[in-house]
Swiss-Prot record:
UniProt name for this protein: Phosphate import ATP-binding protein PstB
Species this chain originates from: Methanosarcina acetivorans (strain ATCC 35395 / DSM 2834 / JCM 12185 / C2A)
Pfam families per the UniProt record, alphabetical: ABC_tran
EC number: 7.3.2.1
Reaction equation(s) it catalyzes: phosphate(out) + ATP + H2O = ADP + 2 phosphate(in) + H(+)
Top enzyme category: translocase
PANTHER family documented for this protein: ABC TRANSPORTER I FAMILY MEMBER 17 (PTHR43423:SF1)
Gene3D superfamilies: P-loop containing nucleotide triphosphate hydrolases
Domain ABC transporter as annotated: residue spans: 13-253
Main location: membrane
CDD domains listed in its UniProt record: ABC_PstB_phosphate_transporter
Length: 258
């Protein structure tokens, strides 16, 4: 049973009756959700509950998995992203993704950021401005402006994760998916990423998967609780954490299981 927010202000992503199977195993069951524009939506739940599988449906990353089958509808700005003829490369430009562990390319800081724009045909003379914009947006410019030609692998873990965020921003997405972006970081780096996420929602719609419920409470406007492939409850974060409608939501948030 799902308590979902209906008719939210400016839904940018609408998911209707989404089901997903890996071979014979069903991993997502009848998920419906509206994700508002220019907001942070956190997805919480125990390991293996379907959170990461769900966000990979939003940019069709699950297409890369053998024997993965999807039914249902996922719309972004009223466009069904699973319709025939959808340009998946363009979709993944619109819907960027930041992964659990920082994954900088083995090249310079500059080339890490310029890589995506080059692929998408950016003019060479514009690349410098794009790189600066992305690094400033990811709060990394002041720490890297004097060493753009240095290898990205020389950055600290927290800096590498902000570099990955900058790399995503460089191709001008509309939506950014974060899959446990702070799980490999220390508390100071985590705090910087959280502050960055809250700043980015002015210009982007953000969906974050996290096992850290305190993080979900700090950064998100909306929260969805997943359990065994089902969306149990979805609503404004304050309501989910202070007055959940489902007993299993309350049990998870209060640490009775997880």
């Amino acid at each position: 049973m799902t308590e979902a927010v209906q008719n939210v202000a400016q839904p940018q992503i609408e998911v209707e009756n989404l089901n997903l199977w890996y071979g014979e195993k069903q991993a997502l069951k009848n998920i419906s959700m509206q994700i508002p524009k220019n907001s942070v939506t956190a997805l919480i739940g125990p390991s293996g509950c379907g959170k990461s599988t769900f966000i990979r449906c939003l940019n069709r990353m699950n297409d890369l998995i053998k024997n993965c089958r999807i039914e249902g509808k996922v719309s972004i700005e009223d466009e069904d992203i699973y319709e025939k003829g959808v340009d998946v490369v363009e979709l993944r430009k619109r819907v960027g993704m930041v992964f659990q562990k920082p994954n900088p390319f083995p090249m310079s800081i500059y080339d890490n950021i310029a890589y995506g724009p080059r692929i998408h045909g950016a003019n060479k003379k514009d690349l410098g401005g794009i790189v600066e914009f992305a690094l400033r947006s990811a709060a990394l410019w002041n720490e890297t402006s004097d060493r753009l030609k240095s290898t990205a692998l020389s950055l600290s873990g927290g800096q590498q994760q902000r570099l990955c965020i900058a790399r995503t921003l460089a191709v001008k997405p509309e939506i950014i998916l974060f899959d446990e972006p702070c799980s490999a970081l220390d508390p100071i780096s985590t705090s910087r990423i959280e502050e960055l996420i809250m700043n980015l929602k002015k210009d982007y719609t953000i969906v974050i998967v996290t096992h850290n419920m305190q993080q979900a409470a700090r950064v998100s406007d909306y929260t969805g609780f997943f359990l065994m492939g089902e969306l149990i409850e979805f609503g404004k974060t304050r309501q989910i954490f202070h007055n959940p409608k489902e007993q299993s939501t309350e049990d998870y948030i209060t640490g009775r299981f997880g």
